[in-house]
Curated annotation (Swiss-Prot):
The lineage of its organism: Bacteria, Pseudomonadati, Pseudomonadota, Gammaproteobacteria, Legionellales. Belongs to the KdsB family. CDD domains: CMP-KDO-Synthetase. This is 3-deoxy-manno-octulosonate cytidylyltransferase. Pathway: Nucleotide-sugar biosynthesis; CMP-3-deoxy-D-manno-octulosonate biosynthesis; CMP-3-deoxy-D-manno-octulosonate from 3-deoxy-D-manno-octulosonate and CTP: step 1/1; Bacterial outer membrane biogenesis; lipopolysaccharide biosynthesis. It catalyses: 3-deoxy-alpha-D-manno-oct-2-ulosonate + CTP = CMP-3-deoxy-beta-D-manno-octulosonate + diphosphate. One of its GO terms (biological process) is CMP-keto-3-deoxy-D-manno-octulosonic acid biosynthetic process. Activates KDO (a required 8-carbon sugar) for incorporation into bacterial lipopolysaccharide in Gram-negative bacteria. It holds the Pfam family CTP_transf_3. GO terms for cellular component: cytosol. It comes from Coxiella burnetii (strain RSA 331 / Henzerling II).
Amino acid sequence: MEFRVIIPARFDSTRLPGKALVDIAGKPMIQHVYESAIKSGAEEVVIATDDKRIRQVAEDFGAVVCMTSSDHQSGTERIAEAAVALGFEDDEIIVCLQGDEPLIPPDAIRKLAEDLDEHDNVKVASLCTPITEVDELFNPHSTKVVLNRRNYALYFSHAPIPWGRDTFSDKENLQLNGSHYCHVGIYAYRVGFLEEYLSWDACPAEKMEALEQLRILWHGGRIHMVVAKSKCPPGVDTEEDLERVRAYF
């Protein structure tokens, strides 16, 4: 099975401006992400960006770069433009690896592509990890996902879902029971689906939560979740996240 990785990267992050180029252990963050993608065995790895600074840095460490519009509202929209520009076929599998996930294991990238290949009836495959700490469950920067019994996503939210009606009022003594999952921002799609995604209007829930994957559920698409057996390392959304990631190195 062949797959490609596209890494969407922008400079103007709201919570941590310029984060794609922040230094982590002597390398820009985007380089760590790129190197993980290369180790996954992907047929090709491309960085998609609208920023000349990111392009220059990426080309300096040997990456292929596709320049895209600055008007995109999500990584999926940026990847869709890049896939068309690069001439990818509709049935090819693309893994969207966000440029702020420097600690994603290469095996997880490949596993996601394999999962989509095994599920012809789904639009997207994505990754989640069990939540084991109460602070993470209530962290608004962490995206939670509720699954059905076959590991299809029912809903995503920044809120702590599913809500424990009888237990969440006492957070200090709260014991998690394995029912809560954190969504990791990595997706696998077929190229043909990206064109379909762009034809859909953003839905109310997507706008409220600022979560692009809710558009897929709103329009009746299915997202199959790969549940990691162990906790995946954190992505970088804030200065605090950056310090935690630096500590890993």
